[in-house]
């Protein structure tokens, strides 16, 4: 196996071991394994050799290997620098051109087995050795060994043996191997490098891990980790290799055998066990690791003093195994590793010298009689009281162990309930637990009583209190007695009772309520047996208790209200009013977490609230106990908050209220029995005694009792209300007034104090103080007056019958057509309505006023009387009144509708004021008999005119129900455009036909002379003969007719005579005809030919004329369409100008309040309307464009049909086809522009609506956004204006093209298009080639990168390993080859990228890629510069660089310079692209010149066609002239160099094809080069299969 392959294997191993790591922490500041860089540890290191030539000087000869050849001999002199070969040359810089070497004495001096030579290399520090390499200047030894020491004072361990006689020399098997499980630190022996050849430059490389089974599990193999560790390397040279000629003892032969080594290299890393990324020299110039991971030592082989929490370990790829700090709780900075502690706890750091009175492996505990303070920082002295404590040691909180009855942290005082501290402790107090706090005076023993308790031992209630209860924090309950007594006691016969709601069957009457008292439904769950409330917002919702929990709950004072409650979400926001009680005009509330309750959560919890006024139960506001009891006595509401956040729910269950009731059971001792003062009765003094009443009945039982007072009209009164049982027509609480219907002073005290009132129906009355007049005060409804003798306002009648019979007062009936708040709506006597409203009138407002109509009695005001609103033009005498029922106005003749505002069908002129006039439309000439309501113009059939559609239009005829037909008289053949009634035109002389569009016999049409011209005289003879024959035929016909019509009988003889006569006549005619035929036969033949020719030419010219006429008509229509489109565009532009002007005038002001945004609404509405109008305009433009497209299509089809088969005018068809396509394209563009205008109009409308929507949401208004929107709309309007200008220009271009009607031949341009298509195809191929080239470039760059990596490895190898000369030369030979291949591939890739396509855009792309390549080259150059700088530094540190490496660097620099040419070549390609663009422009100019030439030829052809159309007689010479002119035109066309220009274009296209082919070829070459690079890559070995062996010396 080659040395190079072995080194690659080691490179792979180093990469797998992350050997190139530079940092000991990763990007997340986490520790990771790190190692120093891979170096040649032997470089410039001192080697001690046990034998060296030159002392004294001696001669040695160079071994040639050929017997009998004169040997080349030299002198080795240690004193001469030029001739010495000391051990210093073993580790210097190896230069193949000027080699240096160490050399031993020759065999002549006794250097041969068993004598051996040792070469000892001291590394100065332990290294992880990867390989040891020796490069021999002579032939390699027959036997030598490599040893190593793991420490500077350790034993030598054999590394590897090399021998041609392994068993004989080293007692080792030749090429042995190590099996799994065997000792992997044994040295092996091999004969692989023991041949005598080569005689010069042989390499021997030993890989320390090769052949070791655990090499691929190196991180977990301590054996191999120790195996590769070395501080010293020794090479022992045991036996020289010879040819056997030494047996002759020839001095010259013996002088040719010696040891010589030119390079001694040791590859490895400074050993830092994965905890350092570099080794540095310390203050003693000794090489040590710059340790990280809290490690130290020369090899980072121990943890720092305070980092011993786990045992030191070597870092691995999976675990950096950094040393961890000891946990001394901040009490020590010293620790050591305790293996036992580590095995027991997993933490081995044992702290030393703990501070702050602490102790333990982690300083985690305090010293005896010390405790740790609350902050945990230090330990404090316990300080226990010796009298009161049981021990001097306290607990972790500093509390001492106290004697009975003693308390305090230091046991220095008595506990509550104890007193008199002594050696025996404290004595207990004798306090009543129900009335005391269980504490007493520590000196006297007097008990501390609860708030409402008294006595030395707190065993009795204070005055005004009762029921000494241990559960009562105040001890005793205050007497209530409705505040009428302060003396009470516990009542007998009452037991404990609970009012509950368990919600087992329903919600039991519980309700939900918000703060605004609005009701919220309560949800009851039968499955969970609970009720719930759900909120949508943060406003709270309360559960409201039903009646059974309310009213008199006085017996619940001091007792508990209990409930189970949970919430849906945990984010509850509590308040001060979570539980609310209301009653007797009082209101108290408490938070849910008051009185020691927990915070509500998603789990059900029990909440307990004591109904008491003490401050321990913080009901707010704070009220006295009497008020709290008063509240409970008349409890009107219990509310429990159910929701505490938005979108949440609260769940309530098991509500109970403790109270008391009479009956057996657990005694309720909190029920009072009062001792009442005089005037009071009842258990709670809640009643007044006989003869007493409430002084303030509204206070009910809280009112004091006083004696009854009835002003002498009663002896008794109601004890609760104080109401007297009044007599003598008196009334009132104390009989202090007369009852209704009576008057007088009841306080006098006599039985006649009150008298009856003089009023009807028992009405009440009063006495006027000044006049003592009795006045009725409560008259019956509808009456008024002192004695109720008058009808009230709004009523009528005669209640006293003063004006006739008695009539009771009744309400006036006005059909709800009066103002009920008005006064005097009707007459009080008759009931007539006086103030009718809603346009009504009448006694009872039961009809509409004049000029109004409708139902005055309608219940709905809108259905009552409405104004007539008669039309003044259509109403009789311009009346304003109408039918009050139907609203119909009186209409003039032939006027209709309710308001007389329209004419009948077939009538008009409503504004005349005299009625409508009949249209009188002609039933034949009009469409429907109707006319314009203002002008009276009838709707006419096509071609019909006149106000009544009674006649045909000018130049029309055939008046009928379908309209009039156009005369369509030929303008040249008719005297006028108007025809006769039968449609026949008035013809000019020589013209015939209904349209005067044909010449009569013996007349012909000549385009050069107006009108039909008479044929030559020769045609007159023919015409005369024809007329004679026609006359004879006519005579014959007349004869036959006369025979049929005659009444006379013709005899057979006469008939035969006449028949013979006729036959004779016919034969004469036949003979004359035959004679004429013979005479004029030649003339007829010639005439027939001429006529045939003329007919063909005439038909052809007529077809052309029709085509031109149709084309002109189509062009006119298209021009009209274009004109219409221009008008629409102008209109759109005007509208846009208006829109821009309106937008520019927009001044959006911020309203000072949130007022009405009507102005902005109007603006948005106007913008929306404008956008809709633009949309309509765009639709119209689109329609016109479509019509123009259809027109162009129709024109194209007509022209194509007319010119089909005409070879000479095929160019015309092509040009018209082109025109059609251009018109179609323009129409499509117009449609697109219209669609764009349409879309922009819609977008403007949408934005306007959006502005409107935004404005309607004011306030606030973001003026900045509005200004931006306005500016944006302005910009869009400006863009739209530009778009319209562009569209107008396109329309102008189209119009000019249509006006020109030039039939230009574009064959050249068509061929140019074909060439363009070919070029497009070529460009497509170029694009495909570009894609392939880019992919190839990508692969080439990837291969380049891989080769560059290999090059870097080789460079690093050459710099640091300094292999033997043969391998180095081989590597150097391969490096230029690889670089040359890479450079060539990159150069071709660059050329392919730069040359793909001949367009400027492709050249720009190529230039960009060239710049990128230049950047890559610059990067490579920078890397090379750095390498060069490193080399220069190495040169300064040592002696000089190897010239071969310089040569390699020169080759790399040349490659970089070659890459720099890339940009220049890309610029050249840019210039070539520009030239190609210029060529394309020249081709376009040539095409234009060809177009001009074709146009000129076309004009000539048109002139010839014109001459053909002006033939006045057949002239063969003229036809020959035309033929010659046509040939001249063809020659002229041929002289226009069209063929040459076409050939030039073809040549350009062929050149482009050649360029593309060249690019394809280059791409194929690039692919081949890439394949070659891949082959080179694949030939690099991936492993080393040497099996070296070592043995101990």
Swiss-Prot record:
Glycosylation sites: 44, 118, 560, 634, 654, 1006, 1091, 1159, 1189, 1207, 1254, 1364, 1379
Residue ranges of the region described as Domain II and I: 1014-1593
Single GO cellular component term: basement membrane
Intrachain disulfide bonds: 270-279, 272-289, 291-300, 303-323, 326-335, 328-351, 354-363, 366-379, 382-394, 384-400, 402-411, 414-426, 429-440, 431-447, 449-458, 461-476, 708-717, 710-724, 726-735, 738-754, 757-765, 759-776, 779-788, 791-809, 812-826, 814-833, 836-845, 848-865, 868-882, 870-889, 891-900, 903-916, 919-931, 921-938, 940-949, 952-964, 967-979, 969-985, 987-996, 999-1012
Coiled coil (UniProt feature): 1021-1580
Cell compartment(s), UniProt: Secreted, Extracellular space, Extracellular matrix, Basement membrane
Residue ranges of domain Laminin N-terminal in the record: 30-269
Chief location of this protein within or outside the cell: secreted
GO BP: any one term: optokinetic behavior
Keywords, in A-Z order: Basement membrane, Cell adhesion, Coiled coil, Disulfide bond, Extracellular matrix, Glycoprotein, Laminin EGF-like domain, Repeat, Secreted, Signal
Subunit structure: Laminin is a complex glycoprotein, consisting of three different polypeptide chains (alpha, beta, gamma), which are bound to each other by disulfide bonds into a cross-shaped molecule comprising one long and three short arms with globules at each end.
Function in brief: Binding to cells via a high affinity receptor, laminin is thought to mediate the attachment, migration and organization of cells into tissues during embryonic development by interacting with other extracellular matrix components.
PANTHER family for this protein: LAMININ SUBUNIT GAMMA-1 (PTHR10574:SF270), NETRIN/LAMININ-RELATED (PTHR10574)
Protein name, UniProt field: Laminin subunit gamma-1
Native source organism of the sequence: Danio rerio
Gene from which the chain derives: lamc1
């Amino acid at each position: 196996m080659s040395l190079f392959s072995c080194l690659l294997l080691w490179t792979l191993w180093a990469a797998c071991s992350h050997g190139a790591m530079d940092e000991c922490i990763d990007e997340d500041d986490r520790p990771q394994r790190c190692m120093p860089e891979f170096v040649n540890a032997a470089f410039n290191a001192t080697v001690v050799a046990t034998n060296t030539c030159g002392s004294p000087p001696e001669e040695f000869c160079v071994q040639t290997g050929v017997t009998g050849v004169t040997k080349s001999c030299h002198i080795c002199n240690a004193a001469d620098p030029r001739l010495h070969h000391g051990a210093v040359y073993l580790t210097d810089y190896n230069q193949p051109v000027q080699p240096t070497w160490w050399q031993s004495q020759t065999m002549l001096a006794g250097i041969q087995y068993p004598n051996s030579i040792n070469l000892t290399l001291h590394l100065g520090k332990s290294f992880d050795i990867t390989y040891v390499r020796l490069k021999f200047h002579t032939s390699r030894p027959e036997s030598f060994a490599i040893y190593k020491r793991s420490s500077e004072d350790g034993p030598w361990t054999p590394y590897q043996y090399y021998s041609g006689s392994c068993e004989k020399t080293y007692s080792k098997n030749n090429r042995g191997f190590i099996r799994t499980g065997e000792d992997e630190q044994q040295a092996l022996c091999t004969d692989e490098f023991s041949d005598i050849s080569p005689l010069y430059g042989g390499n021997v490389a030993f890989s320390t891990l090769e052949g070791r089974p655990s090499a691929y599990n190196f991180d977990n193999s301590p054996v191999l980790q120790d195996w590769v560790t070395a501080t010293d390397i020794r090479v022992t040279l045991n036996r020289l290799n010879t040819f056997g000629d030494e047996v002759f003892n020839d001095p010259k032969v013996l002088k040719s055998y010696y040891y010589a080594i030119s390079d001694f290299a040791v590859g490895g890393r400074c050993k830092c066990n994965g905890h350092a990324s570099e080794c540095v020299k310390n203050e003693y110039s000794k090489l040590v690791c710059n340790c990280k991971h809290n490690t130290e030592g020369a090899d980072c082989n121990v943890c720092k003093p305070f980092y011993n929490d786990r045992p030191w370990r070597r870092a691995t790829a999976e675990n950096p195994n950094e040393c961890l700090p000891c946990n001394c709780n901040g009490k020590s900075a010293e620790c050591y590793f305790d293996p036992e502690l580590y095995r027991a706890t997993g933490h081995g750091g044992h702290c030393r010298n703990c501070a702050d009175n602490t102790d333990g492996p982690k300083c985690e505990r305090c010293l005896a009689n010390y405790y740790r303070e609350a902050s945990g920082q230090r330990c404090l002295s316990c300080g226990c009281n010796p009298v009161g404590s049981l021990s001097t040691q306290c607990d972790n909180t500093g509390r001492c162990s106290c004697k009975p009855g003693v308390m305090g942290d230091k046991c220095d005082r008595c506990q509550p309930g104890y007193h008199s501290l002594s050696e025996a402790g404290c004595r207990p107090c004798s306090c009543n637990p129900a009335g005391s706090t269980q504490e007493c005076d520590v000196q006297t023993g007097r008990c501390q009583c609860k708030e409402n308790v008294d006595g030395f031992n707190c065993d009795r209630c204070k005055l005004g209190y009762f029921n000494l209860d241990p559960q009562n924090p105040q001890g005793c309950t205050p007497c209530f007695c409705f505040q009428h007594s302060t003396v009470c006691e516990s009542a007998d016969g009452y037991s404990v009772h609970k009012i509950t709601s368990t919600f087992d069957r329903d919600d039991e009457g519980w309700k939900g309520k918000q703060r605004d008292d609005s009701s919220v439904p309560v949800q009851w769950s039968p499955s969970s047996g609970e009720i719930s409330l759900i909120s949508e917002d943060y406003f709270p919702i309360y559960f409201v208790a039903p009646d059974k929990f309310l009213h008199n709950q006085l017996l619940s004072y001091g007792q508990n209200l209990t409930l189970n409650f949970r919430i849906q979400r945990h984010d509850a926001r509590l308040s001060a009013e979570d539980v609310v009680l209301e009653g007797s005009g009082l209101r108290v509330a408490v938070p849910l977490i008051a009185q020691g309750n927990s915070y509500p959560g998603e789990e059900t919890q029990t909440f307990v609230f004591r109904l008491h006024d003490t401050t321990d139960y913080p009901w707010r506001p704070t009220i006295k106990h009497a008020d709290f009891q008063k509240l409970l006595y008349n409890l009107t509401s219990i509310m429990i908050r159910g929701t505490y956040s938005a979108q949440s729910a609260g769940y309530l269950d098991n509500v109970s209220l403790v109270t008391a009731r009479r009956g057996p059971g657990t005694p309720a001792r909190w029920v009072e029995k009062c001792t009442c003062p005089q005037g009071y009765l009842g258990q709670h003094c809640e009643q007044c005694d006989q003869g007493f009443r409430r002084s303030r009945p509204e206070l009910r039982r809280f009112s004091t009792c006083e004696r009854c007072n009835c002003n002498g009209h009663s002896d008794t009164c109601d004890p609760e209300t104080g109401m007297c049982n009044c007599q003598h027509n008196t009334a009132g609480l104390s009989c202090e007034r007369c009852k209704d219907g009576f008057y007088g002073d009841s306080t006098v005290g006599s039985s006649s104090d009150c008298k009856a009132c003089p009023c009807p129906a028992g009405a009440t009355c009063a006495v006027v103080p000044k006049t003592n007049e009795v006045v009725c005060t409560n008259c019956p409804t509808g009456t008024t007056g002192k004695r109720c003798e008058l009808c009230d306002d709004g009523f009528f009648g005669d209640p006293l019958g003063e004006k006739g019979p008695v009539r009771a007062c009744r309400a006036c009936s006005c059909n709800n057509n009066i103002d009920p708040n008005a006064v005097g709506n009707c007459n009080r006597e008759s009931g007539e309505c006086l103030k009718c409203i809603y346009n009504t009138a009448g006694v009872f407002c039961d009809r509409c006023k004049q000029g109004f109509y409708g139902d005055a009695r309608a219940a709905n005001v809108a259905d009552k009387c409405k104004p007539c609103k008669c039309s003044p033009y259509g109403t009789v005498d311009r009346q304003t009144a109408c039918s009050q029922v139907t609203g119909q106005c009186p209409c003039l003749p032939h006027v209709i509708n309710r308001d007389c505002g329209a004419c009948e069908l077939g009538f008009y002129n409503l504004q005349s004021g005299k009625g409508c006039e009949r249209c009188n439309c002609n039933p034949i000439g009009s469409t429907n008999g109707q006319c314009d309501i203002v002008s009276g113009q009838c709707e006419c059939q096509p071609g019909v005119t006149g106000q009544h559609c009674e006649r045909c239009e000018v130049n029309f005829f055939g008046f009928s129900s379908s309209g009039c037909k156009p005369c369509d008289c030929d303008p040249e053949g008719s005297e006028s455009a108007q025809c006769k009634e039968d449609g026949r035109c008035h013809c000019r002389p020589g013209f015939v036909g209904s349209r005067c569009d044909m010449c009569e016999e013996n007349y012909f049409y000549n385009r050069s002379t107006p009108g039909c011209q008479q044929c030559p005289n020769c045609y007159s003879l023919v015409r005369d003969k024809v007329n004679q024959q026609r006359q004879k035929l006519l005579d014959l016909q007349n004869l036959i007719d006369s025979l049929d019509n005659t009444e006379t009988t013709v005899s057979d003889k006469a008939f035969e005579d006449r028949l013979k006569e006729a036959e004779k006549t016919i034969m004469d005619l036949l003979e004359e005809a035959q004679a004429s035929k013979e005479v004029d036969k030649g003339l007829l033949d010639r005439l027939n030919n001429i006529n045939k020719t003329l007919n063909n030419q005439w038909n052809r010219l007529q077809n052309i004329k029709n085509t031109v006429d149709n084309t002109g008509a189509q062009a006119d229509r298209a021009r009209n369409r274009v004109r219409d489109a221009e008008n629409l565009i102008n209109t759109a532009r005007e509208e846009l100008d208006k829109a821009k002007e309106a937008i520019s005038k927009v001044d959006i002001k911020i309203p000072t309040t949130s007022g009405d945004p009507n102005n902005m609404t109007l603006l948005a509405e106007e913008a929306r309307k404008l956008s809709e109008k633009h949309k309509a305009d765009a639709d119209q433009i689109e329609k016109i464009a479509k019509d123009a497209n259809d027109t162009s299509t129709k024109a194209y089809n007509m022209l194509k049909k007319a010119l089909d088969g005409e070879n000479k005018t095929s160019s015309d068809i092509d040009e018209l086809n082109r025109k059609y396509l251009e018109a179609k394209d323009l129409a499509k563009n117009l449609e697109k522009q219209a669609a764009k205008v349409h879309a922009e109009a819609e977008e403007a409308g949408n934005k306007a609506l959006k502005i409107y929507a935004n404005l309607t949401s004011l306030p606030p208004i973001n003026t900045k956004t509005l200004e931006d929107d306005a500016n944006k709309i302005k910009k869009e309007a400006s863009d739209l204006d530009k778009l319209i200008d562009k569209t107008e220009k396109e329309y102008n271009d189209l119009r000019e093209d249509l006006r020109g009607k030039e039939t230009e031949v574009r064959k050249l341009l068509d061929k140019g298009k074909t060439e363009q298509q070919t070029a497009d195809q070529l460009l497509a191929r170029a694009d495909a080639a570009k894609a392939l080239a880019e992919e190839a470039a990508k692969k080439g760059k990837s291969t380049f990168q891989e080769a560059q990596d290999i090059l870097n490895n080789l460079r690093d190898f050459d710099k640091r390993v300094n292999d033997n000369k043969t391998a180095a030369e081989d590597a150097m030979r391969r490096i230029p080859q690889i670089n040359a291949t890479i450079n060539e591939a990159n150069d071709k890739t660059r050329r392919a990228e730069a040359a793909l396509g001949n367009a400027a855009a492709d050249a720009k792309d190529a230039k960009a890629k060239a710049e990128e390549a230049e950047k890559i080259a610059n990067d490579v150059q920078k890397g090379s510069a750095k390498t060069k700088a490193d080399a220069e530094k190495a040169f300064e540190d040592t002696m000089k660089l190897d010239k071969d490496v310089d040569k390699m660097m020169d080759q790399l620099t040349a490659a970089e310079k070659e890459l720099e040419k890339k940009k220049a070549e890309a610029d050249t390609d840019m210039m070539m692209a520009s030239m190609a663009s210029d060529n394309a422009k020249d081709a376009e100019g040539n095409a234009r010149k060809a177009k001009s030439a074709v146009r000129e030829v076309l004009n000539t052809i048109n002139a010839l066609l014109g001459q053909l159309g002006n033939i006045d007689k057949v002239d063969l010479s003229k036809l020959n002239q035309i033929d010659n002119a046509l040939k001249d035109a063809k020659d002229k066309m041929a002289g226009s160099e069209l063929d040459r220009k076409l050939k030039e274009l073809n040549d350009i296209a062929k050149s482009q094809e050649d360029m593309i082919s060249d690019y394809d070829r280059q791409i194929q070459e690039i692919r081949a080069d890439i394949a070659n690079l891949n082959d080179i890559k694949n030939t690099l070995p991936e492993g080393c299969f040497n099996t070296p062996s070592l043995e101990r010396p």
